[in-house]
Amino acid sequence: MPFALYTRCMGLSLYAATTSQGKLRDFAAAAAAHSIEVASLPRLGKIPAPEENGATFAANATLKAVYYSRYAPGALVLADDSGLEVDALDDAPGVRSARFAADAGLTDSPDANDNTDVWNNMVLLQRMAGVHPAQRTARYRCVLVAARDGQPLYTAEGAVEGLILDAPRGTGGFGYDPLFYLPDLDRTMAELDLETKHGLSHRGRAFAALLAQMKI
């Protein structure tokens, strides 16, 4: 079910096309920095998800924004596509970040659907086994697209550089956060509080860039 971000002072509604609770928390933190409230909109009901078959983050974010905007006439619909790019893996998992374990054939496991992050991290660790610490460079990348009535209007991108650890650290965040290490902070993404994470994360940077384009 999509979620809405809206600012009362401008009378603007943004529908964020995501059911990811982790992404919703990130958006909430980003929105709070701009005095924007985040709320769910159950009146939209359940909308069937489109097939994410784009080859890039921008392509997937655009197709989702355009698709969901047709269900909310007149409103701006915000879609995110993001993931992890690991240099030693030729930028994999990339657009397949959420399905890394599934692509490795782990969907037959009875726990795969309930522990997707755990399985994805396990596959990443397996693929990175034996890679020298200096060669474990990676980045989180996010592309946000806002569309109205089937037309994309704004596109913004954010990225943050880091390293992939050989074991998880921290209990916060989601996705690959326990393995994504920030050398300047000596912390993983999973060890950061939400406010700090928003200030430097790929999604926070993309969100700030999008709002700047929209002059919010």
Predicted segments, located by residue:
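Anionic-ligand binding patches
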Residues: G11-Y15, Q21-I216
